[in-house]
Amino acid sequence: MEDDAPVIYGLEFQARALTPQTAETDAIRFLVGTQSLKYDNQIHIIDFDDENNIINKNVLLHQAGEIWHISASPADRGVLATCYNRTSDSKVLTCAAVWRMPKELESGSHESPDDSSSTAQTLELLCHLDNTAHSNMACVVWEPMGDGKKIISLADNHILLWDLQESSSQAVLASSASLGGKGQLKFTSGRWSPHHNCTQVATANDTTLRGWDTRTMSQIYCIENAHGQLVRDLDFNPNKQYYLASCGDDCKVKFWDTRNVTEPVKTLEEHSHWVWNVRYNHSHDQLVLTGSSDSRVILSNMVSISSEPFGHLVDDDDISDQEDHRSEEKSKEPLQDNVIATYEEHEDSVYAVDWSSADPWLFASLSYDGRLVINRVPRALKYHILL
């Protein structure tokens, strides 16, 4: 059973921002934001045609500045948010804004990657997440499963909850909270939990993970020294409401149960440099992706702490007598955690990895040199999980 070869797409600029087009559940589509100091920055809309194993793309101009973070609306295929750098009075500010892509590009393109004659189109600015009080936006996170009207931005040591109004043309600050404590505390990353009616957000600052209740903007849990060095990213298990994964500059990936934060449930030490990204598969939460500046992407099978620790359980009625004994033996033993595959198509730091929102077996990774790689979960494992 041969696995499909990875598909590679090269951007002409450096890049570190990647997101699937979250509201698109039929076509495989990713958005990539570039980081260029000399030229106008771009957002590449990458369409993957999995039948023919080819990539089609469209390019949007993002003239506001180099893109540090990109996220897509969960409700509207045409709306996205970016965090970007701009200079003001010889100071660099990281701002955030919500944009709309041209209508005809929302559902993808049929242009081949080598067609360079086409002209790039521009994004329509919907609103700035006005940051006059806060100068450094780390990321913008949309309310999962929401109507695309609620977003959170992390700026310096503040969490800002925004309501988007008037077709997203206006952002109203609904509530906020800030990190207290000594020194210049600064958020590095955050995720909005899909559980608890979407009332919880987790953030990372320095080596600490914190949970927040968005109704009161108060802290609900705190994991101090979650990592030995800076925490780079975190993600919620989509099927187990108290489970959270984090990664950081100590080269580790840790899994937490937020009801008991004294120590991690599990720790992975497979990378040899900073781990920038961790992502749970949206459907099969034992599949966990990580990307690191060791230039590798690792796919792990964390089945023992997943929602199906005994594999795919079958109803008794479906089992014939001969199979009965075999499946009984199989179901007693939890399956073992292991590294499924290490992907080495990158030659530079991998700053972003993410799963497709349309195909649970497909993911993209992005390295700083502008190389986007699309890979799939090995077929043997896919069938093992499904059957």
From Swiss-Prot:
Coiled-coil region(s): none
Arranged from A to Z, the UniProt key words for this protein are:
Acetylation, Golgi apparatus, Phosphoprotein, Repeat, WD repeat
Q: Name one GO cellular component term.
A: trans-Golgi network
User: What is the originating organism of this protein?
Assistant: Macaca fascicularis (Crab-eating macaque)
Residues recorded as bearing Phosphoserine in the entry? 320
- The domain of life for this entry's organism is Eukaryota
What subunit structure does UniProt give? Interacts with two multisubunit tethering complexes: EARP composed of VPS50, VPS51, VPS52 and VPS53 subunits and GARP complex composed of VPS51, VPS52, VPS53 and VPS54 subunits. Interacts with SNAP29.
Q: Where is the composition biased (Basic and acidic residues)?
A: 322-334
Keyword Repeat appears in the UniProt entry: yes
Q: Please explain the role this protein plays, according to its UniProt record.
A: Acts as a component of endosomal retrieval machinery that is involved in protein transport from early endosomes to either recycling endosomes or the trans-Golgi network. Mediates the recruitment of Golgi-associated retrograde protein (GARP) complex to the trans-Golgi network and controls early endosome-to-Golgi transport of internalized protein. Promotes the recycling of internalized transferrin receptor (TFRC) to the plasma membrane through interaction with endosome-associated recycling protein (EARP) complex.
Q: Name one GO biological process term.
A: protein ubiquitination
**Record's subcellular location:** Golgi apparatus, trans-Golgi network
Q: Which family does it belong to?
A: Belongs to the WD repeat EIPR1 family.
Region (Disordered) residue spans: 310-334
PTM N-acetylmethionine: at which residues?
A: 1
Q: In which broad location class does this protein mainly occur, judging by the first location in its UniProt entry?
A: Golgi
Protein name as it appears in the record: EARP and GARP complex-interacting protein 1
Concerning InterPro entries, the annotation shows: EIPR1 (IPR040323), WD40/YVTN_repeat-like_dom_sf (IPR015943), WD40_repeat_CS (IPR019775), WD40_rpt (IPR001680)
